[in-house]
Amino acid sequence: MREIVHIQAGQCGNQVGAAFWSTIADEHGLDSAGIYHGTSEAQHERLNVYFNEAAGGKYVPRAVLVDLEPGTMDAVKSGKFGNLFRPDNIIYGQSGAGNIWAKGHYTEGAELADAVLDVVRREAEACDALQGFQLTHSLGGGTGSGMGTLLLSKIREEYPDRMMATFSVAPAPKSSDTVVEPYNATLSMHQLVENSDETFCIDNEALSSIFANTLKIKSPSYDDLNHLVSAVMAGVTTSFRFPGELNSDLRKLAVNMVPFPRLHFFMVGFAPLAAIGSSSFQAVSVPELTQQMFDANNMMVAADPRHGRYLTVAALFRGKVSMKEVDEQIRSVQTKNSAYFVEWIPDNVLKAVCSVPPKDLKMSATFIGNSTSIQEIFRRLGDQFSAMFRRKAFLHWYTGEGMDEMEFTEAESNMNDLVSEYQQYQEAGIDEGDEDYEIEEEKEPLEY
């Protein structure tokens, strides 16, 4: 009932996806062969949202794995949960996209797209009541960004009334893997604005700084980063996977979080932030979780919520947590920091509690914020994009695959529009700037 079909595209998307599947398989009591060993009814009750029961009581992820080169797939298959996936659902090319969005979207990726859509269709048909799709990918490369958004638009065309969520890894502001990242990301954003219903934004730099500042680990591996991302993904999807009342499916989450259809880019956070292996032995409480969850330094994307205002927020607590305490804590955050929440959406912080905590933790909290400050990412991308595009630098790699410069111009202006829309709602509701907001100081204002 209410199934979600998951698609992972490109190297980053597959590695993040693999981490997500191993995390939720653990949470639902599945071993690496997909056999259920759970101990509580809650683990089993909504298992079929993400898993399909196959012969012999084996549970198989409703996942489609896509890449334009074989390397990542070999890595996923040889990983701990590599045998979990259905072999026919793993589809890869040989040529690679060479970090060129146009190859993923128009040439190499387009050749593979029909084979992928056949598998997606088969997965969708195996569902009783498909609620929608989720895609994990990065925006800076060629396959995840180019082919990922191609699949997005094709699925949107075929299933217009189903929800579409993406977990999108944005290019980091200072450290880049490829010089053409701004092109790839801007062209992808152009697609995400139109074809995604909810996009959870993540970037490697924000993750690295969480490791450096909060966890005191100087050079984290990609596995460490993916562990953090999978913790957030597991947190975000908790209310779909376990019994609960609030935000119990993709559509309800979107209804609560997206006041205007284009403004569906969320920043995410997780608490308690514990490094891999060192399961946090310190006692955590709801006030501590709330403080850490709203802390600007713990956002998993390089945008500072203190520079904007929250349109909506969803806070999800897991473990033995009293709803009353959650209500009190969230109310206190809102009263002390009222300037950071738009006043024209009353009750814009949603709270949910799920009794099943993550593995090795007593309790945890996941944060989803629709903040106008997310425009910082798009601004930064836009600046980098126009610096190169003005000189037509590297354009031949794209026009050579049949792209037109017009598409670049359109993508650029769509992103600039998005920035202005966020800015407009950030300022809305204040009487033409004559009110100065002051934050009341109380005993311990949450650090923003």
Curated annotation (Swiss-Prot):
Per the record's keyword annotation, is Membrane included, yes or no?
A: no
| Keywords, in A-Z order | Antibiotic resistance, Cytoplasm, Cytoskeleton, GTP-binding, Magnesium, Metal-binding, Microtubule, Nucleotide-binding
Q: Where does GTP bind?
A: 11, 69, 138, 142-144, 204, 226
Q: Where in the cell is it found?
A: Cytoplasm, Cytoskeleton
Q: Where is this chain primarily localised?
A: cytoplasm
Required cofactor(s): Mg(2+)
Q: Which GO terms describe its biological process?
A: cytoplasmic microtubule organization; intracellular distribution of mitochondria; microtubule cytoskeleton organization; mitotic cell cycle; mitotic spindle elongation; mitotic spindle pole body duplication; nuclear migration by microtubule mediated pushing forces; response to antibiotic
What molecular functions are annotated in GO for this chain? GTP binding; GTPase activity; metal ion binding; structural constituent of cytoskeleton
Query: Changing residue 100 to N: reported impact?
Result: Becomes sensitive to rhizoxin
Region (Disordered) spans which residues? 429-448
The record, for Gene3D superfamilies, names: Helix hairpin bin (1.10.287.600), Tubulin/FtsZ, C-terminal domain (3.30.1330.20), Tubulin/FtsZ, GTPase domain (3.40.50.1440)
Give the highest taxon in the source lineage. Answer: Eukaryota
Pfam families listed in its UniProt record: Tubulin, Tubulin_C
Q: Name one GO cellular component term.
A: cytosol
Q: Which residues bind Mg(2+)?
A: 69
Assembly behavior: Dimer of alpha and beta chains. A typical microtubule is a hollow water-filled tube with an outer diameter of 25 nm and an inner diameter of 15 nM. Alpha-beta heterodimers associate head-to-tail to form protofilaments running lengthwise along the microtubule wall with the beta-tubulin subunit facing the microtubule plus end conferring a structural polarity. Microtubules usually have 13 protofilaments but different protofilament numbers can be found in some organisms and specialized cells.
Which family is annotated?
Belongs to the tubulin family.
Q: What else is known?
A: A cold-sensitive nda3 mutation reversibly blocks spindle formation and chromosome movement in mitosis. Rhizoxin, an antibiotic that exhibits potent anti-mitotic activity against most eukaryotic cells except for yeasts, binds to beta tubulin.
Tell me the function of this protein. Tubulin is the major constituent of microtubules, a cylinder consisting of laterally associated linear protofilaments composed of alpha- and beta-tubulin heterodimers. Microtubules grow by the addition of GTP-tubulin dimers to the microtubule end, where a stabilizing cap forms. Below the cap, tubulin dimers are in GDP-bound state, owing to GTPase activity of alpha-tubulin.
What is this protein called in UniProt? Tubulin beta chain
Instruction: Specify the species.
Output: Schizosaccharomyces pombe (strain 972 / ATCC 24843)
